[in-house]
């Protein structure tokens, strides 16, 4: 069949489906050969630890059958080409340890099949496991904020954006990625508070691989060395971490040190707070006064899923007439949990999975809503039995 020459080796255009590390690439090679992008049947492309530099050519978009793309640990620079966002079959994308700059192209968040996977290998020297990361853009010089479109990566098991110059608050959509097992946002310039919706990430337990006598740990949650501030929500204690293990931060990979978080901390974090810059905490205490919310809000119920009781929390910045109502998915009223005037403050009400007649309801998805003044908000919760 027709072939091309790459680095002194002949590759069939039709039959070459994998080009993996380590292909023999001379140190003198500093750019991708144009012929590489004619291997349109490639499903795996892994080129690492070379002297290849400069931008990734837009012709990378020709390789539409790629499932794994790993170009980590090279000298690549410039902006990440948006054409990578057209490689819709990708389940693993690793561009870490290069010199990429600019913002993360929003097109990457259209790669809805990204997830990451563990590959198990057997051989005469024993077994081993390799983790192909879902999305790894760490160790570059990326700037800007993380787009809300990141919430489209619903299958993602690992996300590593560490060691960049990313900034601004985290989008709420990030907390909807409930397939995540590893989240590393360390060593950036992220700001703002951590949302109580972090409690949705119920698979965030870290990933461990092994080879011979060694193991590699991919952090469960690493937020260290940023500019995060405010109070850490109690929902963080819902994460599937062994909080009773004094070495949990090492064994599972948990780190929130070197931020600007303020006390009081959730009880599960007592041993894992690390060093915090509390200079601005006094001002925050005065502003919040611990009793007066600044805005109306309705929190995610806790626990969720639940059986048989869950707590719904909400905040009232002023005295209000309040309705808190549970509905089924057809919009039928199930239970009126609150109906009347309430003073401002931090409020909560429990639902015991019964209707207005006191009868137990069936398992499933329910809606709960609050109406207070001109404020309206609705959330979902799951009853299991």
Feature-to-residue mapping (PLM):
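Residue-level detector of functionally pivotal "anchor" positions at catalytic/ligand-binding pockets or at interdomain
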Residues: 1-9, 111, 279-302, 317, ...
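The feature encodes a structural signal of leucine-rich repeats
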Residues: 32-36, 53-58, 80-82, 104-106, ...
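N-terminal capping/linker segments that flank leucine-rich repeat
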Residues: 1-43, 260-285
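Conserved hydrophobic beta-strand positions in leucine-rich repeat
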Residues: 17-22, 45-47, 69-71, 93-95, ...
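Hydrophobic anchor residues at the C-terminal helix/turn of individual leucine-rich repeat
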Residues: 10, 35-37, 60-61, 84-85, ...
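C-terminal tail/sorting-segment detector
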Residues: 344, 348-350, 359-385
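Glycine-centered coil/turn sites that cap beta-strands in beta-rich domains
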Residues: 287-302, 306-327, 336-339, 348-351, ...
């Amino acid at each position: 069949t027709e072939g091309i020459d790459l680095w002194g080796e002949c590759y069939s255009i039709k039959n070459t489906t994998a080009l993996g590390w380590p292909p023999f690439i001379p140190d003198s090679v500093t750019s991708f050969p144009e012929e590489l992008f004619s291997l349109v049947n490639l499903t795996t492309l892994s080129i690492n630890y070379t002297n290849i530099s400069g931008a990734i050519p837009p012709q990378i978009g020709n390789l539409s059958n790629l499932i794994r793309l790993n170009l980590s640990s090279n000298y690549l620079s410039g902006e990440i080409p948006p054409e990578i966002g057209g490689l819709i079959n990708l389940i693993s994308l690793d561009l870490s340890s290069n010199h990429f700059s600019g913002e993360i192209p929003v097109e990457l968040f259209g790669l809805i099949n990204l997830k990451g996977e563990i590959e198990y290998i057997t051989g005469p020297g024993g077994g081993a496991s390799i983790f192909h990361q879902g999305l790894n853009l760490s160790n570059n010089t990326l700037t800007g904020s993380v787009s809300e479109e990141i919430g489209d990566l619903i299958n993602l098991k690992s996300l590593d954006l560490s060691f960049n110059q990313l900034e601004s608050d985290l989008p709420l959509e990030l907390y909807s990625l409930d397939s995540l097992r590893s989240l590393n946002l360390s060593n950036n310039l992220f700001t703002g508070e951590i949302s109580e919706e972090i409690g949705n990430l119920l698979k965030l337990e870290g990933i461990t691989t092994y080879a011979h006598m060694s193991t590699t740990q991919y952090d469960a949650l690493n937020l260290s060395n940023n500019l995060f501030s405010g109070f850490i929500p109690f929902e963080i204690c819902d994460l599937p971490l062994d909080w009773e293990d004094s070495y949990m931060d090492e064994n599972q990979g948990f780190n929130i040190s070197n931020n600007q978080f303020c006390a009081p901390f959730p009880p599960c974090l007592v041993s894992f707070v690390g060093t915090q810059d509390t200079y601005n905490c006094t001002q925050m205490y005065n502003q919040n006064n611990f009793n007066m919310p600044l805005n109306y809000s309705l929190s995610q119920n806790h626990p969720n899923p639940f059986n048989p009781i869950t707590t719904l929390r909400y905040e009232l910045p002023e005295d209000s007439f309040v309705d808190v109502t549970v509905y089924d998915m057809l919009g039928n009223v199930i239970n009126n949990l609150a109906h009347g005037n309430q003073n401002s403050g931090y409020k909560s009400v429990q639902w015991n999975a019964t209707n207005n007649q006191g009868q137990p309801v069936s398992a499933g998805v329910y809606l709960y809503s609050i109406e207070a003044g001109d404020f309206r908000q609705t959330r979902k919760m799951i009853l299991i039995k």
